[in-house]
Amino acid sequence: MEWSSESAAVRRHRGTAERREGQAAASHPQREASAQEDARGGGRMRGRTESGGESRGAKTALSEARTALALALYLLALRALVQLSLQRLVLSRTSGLQGEFDARQARVYLEHITAIGPRTTGSAENEILTVQYLLEQITLIEEQSNSLHRISVDVQRPTGSFSIDFLGGFTSYYDNITNVVVKLEPQDGAKYAVLANCHFDSVANSPGASDDAVSCAVMLEVLRVMAASPEPLQHAVVFLFNGAEENVLQASHGFITQHPWASLIRAFINLEAAGVGGKELVFQTGPENPWLVQAYVSAAKHPFASVVAQEVFQSGIIPSDTDFRIYRDFGNIPGIDLAFIENGYIYHTKYDTADRILIDSIQRAGDNILAVLKYLATSDMLASSSEYRHGSMVFFDVLGLLVIAYPSRVGSIINYMVVMAVVLYLGRKLLRPNHSNSNYVRDFLCGLGITFISWFTSLVTVLIIAVFVSLIGQSLSWYNYFYIAVCLYGTATVAKIILIHTLAKRFYYVNASDLYLGELFFDTSLFVHCGFLVALTAQGFCSAFMSAVWVAFPLLTKLCVYKDFKKHGAKGRFIALYLLGMFIPYLYGLYLIWAVFEMFTPILGRSGSEIPPDVVLASILAVCVMILSSYFITFIYLVNSTKKTILTLILVCAVTFLLVCSGAFFPYSSNPDSPKPKRVFLQHVSRTFHNLEGSVVKRDSGIWINGFDYTGMSHVTPHIPEINDTIRAHCEENAPLCGFPWYLPVHFLIRKNWYLPAPEISPRNPAHFRLVSKEKMPWDSIKLTFEATGPSHMSFYVRTHKGSTLSQWSLGNGIPVTSRGGDYFVFYSHGLQASAWQFWIEVQVSEEQPEGMVTVAIAAHYLSGENKRSSQLDALKEKFPDWSFPSAWVSTYSLFVF
């Protein structure tokens, strides 16, 4: 196949010369009229005239090398601007000034909290040491407070239960957990309050600096500054330091449903983390109550917010949740949800330490929280917030400099105005009644088809590569080096898109001028983005503003450079003006794309064994390339050739593919400056299975191993040969959750696990489970009452037999909630001390069941203290390579049939 555009031009030139010999009688005025018609039609005529035959000559075509270099440098320059904005954490420094937030003091709080160590609910570290430290600091703050303010402190120990549809759905029960609550109010009291929420507990085996000790440190310092301020408050500010968020949002539920101060709350700010440091992103607001977004816009000193992030998070794509849900669903209170999102690779690991959080990250978070709380605590809207509960908001920041926000209904009007502008622009071309227009309509429709074909084939191409890489065991090769994904999947997408359009240019649009085709494919890209804009707006997505940006600015650019384009052709001046007009959509597009990959890339390292991460990442990358390349398609039709570009992209992709297949890129890293560990859960388990008569029918013990990513144990086996496929765990078909002690109902995400035989364990505080009573109810159901005692964390599982249904129970709202797979899952936890857990379930039985009506199991999890360790567990943990993070604890599993 010949790739050079000059050769096609030569052939057409030769054909034109032959036709010219047979048309010697043609007059000069006729040729002039033909040239004018050619200009009006964009140089588009199938039967070429003299003027059209030279349209792809060297005079009009752009240089391939220069154009490719210009586009590459343009994108790199925009990426540099994005990176610059992300590295600039604070716009102006106020730390240390009187009445301002002091990040140095907040860091002192942070270091004291993390020095306590991992703080799981129910542990002495969480329930005693951390609580004591918080109360000591609050007392000091109270002593230094201004006489204008009054501080009240309460330590709440709630007990309760609720159901949640997170992770497929389950029920939660908590007993005697801890909340430290502080109310700052005027001396004469206040009728209304704004809530600030953080949690001081952590997951097992992690110091939890970013999640969420730094937020509690920020809140302590905000409390200190506000308490010492001579400025009077109109409303109260309630600071909730909750001690059981990692237990799936239990402490916030205990506060909002049981604490007497909860009735005062009219709005809240929740501080969370999905990464370590960087900027804190506003990723949820509402529901409704646009005045809250306006409060953030007006008050925040270092804004960072996106309605796109809100809609992505609320779609459920990200396997995470925050206390925002509890306050929204159980308190019916609007709020703002903020979270650190950078460097999620070390989130919930041993590397989540205080020294990794930059002082500027603390400063910007403190400045923002202090300013917004002050604004809300002195706002008239807080008292009558229900009057402002209407509609949602479109909001987004501009490189962290400012936030733009407007009501979604206004956004819809703007979006449809942009759509109308496109309709008018394209309508003039598509509906013009002449011969050249009929060709344009046909070419436009074919252009749409070619665009979609290029996207579809490029997506199929990268998916084939991703599936192959996954099948040969080289998944996550890009996890430690993200540029590998760009070189493998990004280049493949770009190459395929360019190839499809080059083939269309050579074999379909044979006699069309370059300028005509450049304009045609700009119009098709504009139309596609306009289609997305209409669809998103019609569905009520606030993130449709992005499509509006990608339609409005390119359209304005086209209208501005059109005359220059027609007069001078595709020259360097045209490229400069065109790229300048695309500056805003491409800059903001790259800004959002950074956020997408910053969030999703680490998540793919902990998304379970069933989702091929390469397939997900390749798809996301392909979509991003399609968006970014959409308005660059024009240049494929304006350059003199694409041969070198395609060959370069194929070469980069092929070399990267070979290196990936050879295993040259290891996914994980123990680099102390930027660790990217593999996550592994180790549980030393003792299992006991009873039959209907209560006899033990099976007993075993071992170390149950779960890898939290798609690679399983393939990278671990060379270091620990005993962990291999011969010890793959087998599902106990008749047991709830396959007969293993799942801490949370994530069994559908992790189906590959290993069970290494090990001696039986005997915790000092063993779990006890018994049937208290069994009674037949008047409505022909059986009520079973149970009692359980054990460690601070337990899980209760239920599976009904054929002919039986679980009709009600004493948990949650009384209606049993099934988990994914049909079993029932109850997550239980208690504080430092708790009475026996007694509850009942009611089973509806259609007929007598010889094998029983229900199978139940209880798992005990020892996450703290001496009981969490065993010599075998410690020995195995030590064998794991330094690029891994094995989180280990002891569990028991006991099954009963009734």
Curated annotation (Swiss-Prot):
Zn(2+) 1 binds at H199, D211, E272. The modification N-acetylmethionine is found at M1. Keywords: Acetylation, Disulfide bond, Endoplasmic reticulum, Glycoprotein, Hydrolase, Membrane, Metal-binding, Metalloprotease, Protease, Transmembrane, Transmembrane helix, Zinc. It is a multi-pass membrane protein. Residues 1-66, 415-451, 502-515, 563-573, 637-645 are cytoplasmic. Widely expressed, with highest levels in ovary, kidney, hypothalamus and hippocampus. Within the ovarian follicle, expressed in granulosa cells, but not in oocytes. Present in both preantral and antral follicles, but not in atretic antral follicle. InterPro entries: ERMP1-like_C, ERMP1_1-A_TM, Fxna-like_M28_dom, M28_fam, Peptidase_M28. GO terms for molecular function: metal ion binding; metalloexopeptidase activity. Its main location: endoplasmic reticulum. It is an enzyme of class 3 (hydrolase). The record marks Y347 as: Transition state stabilizer. Zn(2+) 2 binds at D211, E246, H348. Residues 37-57 have a biased composition (Basic and acidic residues). Residues 1-59 are annotated as: Disordered. Its cofactor is Zn(2+). The chain crosses the membrane at residues 67-87, 394-414, 452-472, 481-501, 516-538, 543-562, 574-594, 616-636, 646-666. Pfam families: ERMP1-TM, ERMP1_C, Peptidase_M28. Residues 88-393, 473-480, 539-542, 595-615, 667-898 are lumenal. The active site is at E245. Within the ovary, required for the organization of somatic cells and oocytes into discrete follicular structures. This is Endoplasmic reticulum metallopeptidase 1. It comes from Rattus norvegicus.
